[in-house]
Amino acid sequence: MNEIRQLIKASDAGAKKIDFESTESGTFLNVSEFFTDTIQGENFVGFPATFLRLQGCVLNCSYCDTKKIWKKGGSYSFKELFQLMEQFNVIKQFNVISKLKDGQHLVITGGSPLMQQNSLLKFLQEFRSTYQFIPYIEIENECIIEPSIELLPFIQRWNNSPKLPNCEVAAHKWYIPSVIRSMANLPNSWFKFVINSNEDWDLIEALYLKPGLIHKRHIVLMPMGDTREEVFKNSKTTVNMVIRHNVRYSTREHIVLWDNQIGV
């Protein structure tokens, strides 16, 4: 807990916010994966969804189940992405645009999608101009990069995943209190923690609740695991923690259904 005390002390002194906005944006996105006709498998579980996974990550957590994916891919112009959405037709009935208009969620994930937030904002603005609507958009965020004011109106749900020491990354890289506090002030913001031991709740309290960074009612606990076996192994510990502390539980439904298959 000594490292935890040092982190909290640093937050009281005003931890430095990391700036990832120096890269010039363009009319393209660096994309690692695009797939549709699936469901949101964690946090906001169960909604039909199309996933747009952007390249790159600021952390590279030890338990990440997508690091082999977000390191791959390439640059796509907005026009190419729109064409893909208009043509992509898994069920051979409706394309992605019509499904999004009908209520399917667009989940923007990574890696760290806010690494490209300037280009992402331009993409969403052009989407709105082209199709005359904005879908229900969920976006993943590690609470390291603060979103721009201009991006906020486009996002219906912030799926935040602040970290714990179990990510096995140096703590100063993932504990940015000013960003966490800003995200907690958004009404559509939830905080998902990955759990693999009973000690994890003590860390959540020490790092996030006692300093007043987030609200307990917006906490979601999810078992660690990138295979069905690992998720089941950690589920009971996580559920017991949820019951004991009166917070929400999220499974990893895509892992439960399809194990470690990608693109689902």
Describe the role of every protein-language-model region.
Residues N2-E24, L29-I39, P48-A49, Q55-R157:
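Conserved Radical SAM active-site core
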